[in-house]
């Protein structure tokens, strides 16, 4: 059901119910839903049951009055074909064939804009995701964040929000110091396990690569950073630290580039300290009397803001706990004008939510409760050749995102330049194909298979099938399809496909409301299923010219919606498979 149709039906119900509630305090809300069973019609409404009890009337009798008024209203204008009363008082409506078919022309007229809206009206939204420590290659968990965060950003952008994609670099703290000593040890010729190897050092082969380039006095730079040239002095730990961080930021940039993810801004944790924002945040909380000292540490009264216990802000050794810069960072987000902030993070960050929100509330600068929003994802298990893969030689302790993209890409044809599109498509689609808060098993063998079991192949093949059919139609111009008579589209499979096309804008808005890009993947899988079922049941290029043209137009619209949905989640729409 298209938005314009939904609005018209809502207004018809409002007009029908007005006489029934006149003189009362009732102000019922018209809620329209799509029946789960298509045989029940196109639209379901429970309005009669909402008002029957307060009016002390039988809900079915109320429904009869509403239906009569609905169908008699001149504003109906061939929108509703029939209405039925079901169960205790549900009203099920069937749209006219012309109303169902109108989605095709809407899709063709709007093209890549179909499904988009101005719901956000330019409201500023910042979505932070990946935000990895620059201490190693991106892992599969970062990949899930990348897929979720980028798709979510595209969802908000499609609905008229002013979206900023931000990567927060945790470039301060113990882990960065560990990185520097790990590279220093490798530069001195030490190997993991050898005498003198630092405790808790990073063991991956990438540490040796950094050490080699440091000794060679090479220059590296991240996408938003100044070039950093290695000094080659193995005793200069600060030079090693700066070079190693820049090196790994560049490596992470390359991983994200292969994954098709681009950020609008990079924010360094170290800048919060260098610019005095962390100290200013702590001072503001002290002045507001939201802190106290105990056992040599500074505590924040987070229990005043729904946390289960107060939290240490500054330890007895003078260092800040990890949530303090987070509070400062989100204060900066608010001051930058982002009235909505969304963080996509691993589920291990669950414990930080209450304390960060408590710190923001304690500052009392107008930040609303529940700021920021969090989308937490669970772990990804990787299977390959029927076995779980836990360790990457490159990383030393985990499967990297680059590993997963390359494995899912398949073999390279000798003599051809390696194109990672197939692997990128598979990883991106797979990693948003489940709700973020569910654990996910990524089976590389499934990602490589050309079967219905592979969801990205299944959806892309639907698009390729349509391209093949349209390519066989050699006696016409696609632009002429805008004027085709669609009345011949009366087969049950055609009705199902038309209904699914009309659901696309609703699917996007549902995904936006739930902060759940998986809804887009679900929709695309369902649309592909309807297309495959239709393709197997009905011939498109039939002898009947009117029917052929109507079906070609339906195929063209379906291809457009598949393209729109795939583009939104960063997956290609190949013409051939």
Swiss-Prot record:
GO terms for cellular component: cytoplasm. Keywords: Aminoacyl-tRNA synthetase, ATP-binding, Cytoplasm, Ligase, Nucleotide-binding, Protein biosynthesis. SMART domains: Arg_tRNA_synt_N, DALR_1. Its main location: cytoplasm. It is an enzyme of class 6 (ligase). This is Arginine--tRNA ligase. HAMAP family: Arg_tRNA_synth (MF_00123).
């Amino acid at each position: 059901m298209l938005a314009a149709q939904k609005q018209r039906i809502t207004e018809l119900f409002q007009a029908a119910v007005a006489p029934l509630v006149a003189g009362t305090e009732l102000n019922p809300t018209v809620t329209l839903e799509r029946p789960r069973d298509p045989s029940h019609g196109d639209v379901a409404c429970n309005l009669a049951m909402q008002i029957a009890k307060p009016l002390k009337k039988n809900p079915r009798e109320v429904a009869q009055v509403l239906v009569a008024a609905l169908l008699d209203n001149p504003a109906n204008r061939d929108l509703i074909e029939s209405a039925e009363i079901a169960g205790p008082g549900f009203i099920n409506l069937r749209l006219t064939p012309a109303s169902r078919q109108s989605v095709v022309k809407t899709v063709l007229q709007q093209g890549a804009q179909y499904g988009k809206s101005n719901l956000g009206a330019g409201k500023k939204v910042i979505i932070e995701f990946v935000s990895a420590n620059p201490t190693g290659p991106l892992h599969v968990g970062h990949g899930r964040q990348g897929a979720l965060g980028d798709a979510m950003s595209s969802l908000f952008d499609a609905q008229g929000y002013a979206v900023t994609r931000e990567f927060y670099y945790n470039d301060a703290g113990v882990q960065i110091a560990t990185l520097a000593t790990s590279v220093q040890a490798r530069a001195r010729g030490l190997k993991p396990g050898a005498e003198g190897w630092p405790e808790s050092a990073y063991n991956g082969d990438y540490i040796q690569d950094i050490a080699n380039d440091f000794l060679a006095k090479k220059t590296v730079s991240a996408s938003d950073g100044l070039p950093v040239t290695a000094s080659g002095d193995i005793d200069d730990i600060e030079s090693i630290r700066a070079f190693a961080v820049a090196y790994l930021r560049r490596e992470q940039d390359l991983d994200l580039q292969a994954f098709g993810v681009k950020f609008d801004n990079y924010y360094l944790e170290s800048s919060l300290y260098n610019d005095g924002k962390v100290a200013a945040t702590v001072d503001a909380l002290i002045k507001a009397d939201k802190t106290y000292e105990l056992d040599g540490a500074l505590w924040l009264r987070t229990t005043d803001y729904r946390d289960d216990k107060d939290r240490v802000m500054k330890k007895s050794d003078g260092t800040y706990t990890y949530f303090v810069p987070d509070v400062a960072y989100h204060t900066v987000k608010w001051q930058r004008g982002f009235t909505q902030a969304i963080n996509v993070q691993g589920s291990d960050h669950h414990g930080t939510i209450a304390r960060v929100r408590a710190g923001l509330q304690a500052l009392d600068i107008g930040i609303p409760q529940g700021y920021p929003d969090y989308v937490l994802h669970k772990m990804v298990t990787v299977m390959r050749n029927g076995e779980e893969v836990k360790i990457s030689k490159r990383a030393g302790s985990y499967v990297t995102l680059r590993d997963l993209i390359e494995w899912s890409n398949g073999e390279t044809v000798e003599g051809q330049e390696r194109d990672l599109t197939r692997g990128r498509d598979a990883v991106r689609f797979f990693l948003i194909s489940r709700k973020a808060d569910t654990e996910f098993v990524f089976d590389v063998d499934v990602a490589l298979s050309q079967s219905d079991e592979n969801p990205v192949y299944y959806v892309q093949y639907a698009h390729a099938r349509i391209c093949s059919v349209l390519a066989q139609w050699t006696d016409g111009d696609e632009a002429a399809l805008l004027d085709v008579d669609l009345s011949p589209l009366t087969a049950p499979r055609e009705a199902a496909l038309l209904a699914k096309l009309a659901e696309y804008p609703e699917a996007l808005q549902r995904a936006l409301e739930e902060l759940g890009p998986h809804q887009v993947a679900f929709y695309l899988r369902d649309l592909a299923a309807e297309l495959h079922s239709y393709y197997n049941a009905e011939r498109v290029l039939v002898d009947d010219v009117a029917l052929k043209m109507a079906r070609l137009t339906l195929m063209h619209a379906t291809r457009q919606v598949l393209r729109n949905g795939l583009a939104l989640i960063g997956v290609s729409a190949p013409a051939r498979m």
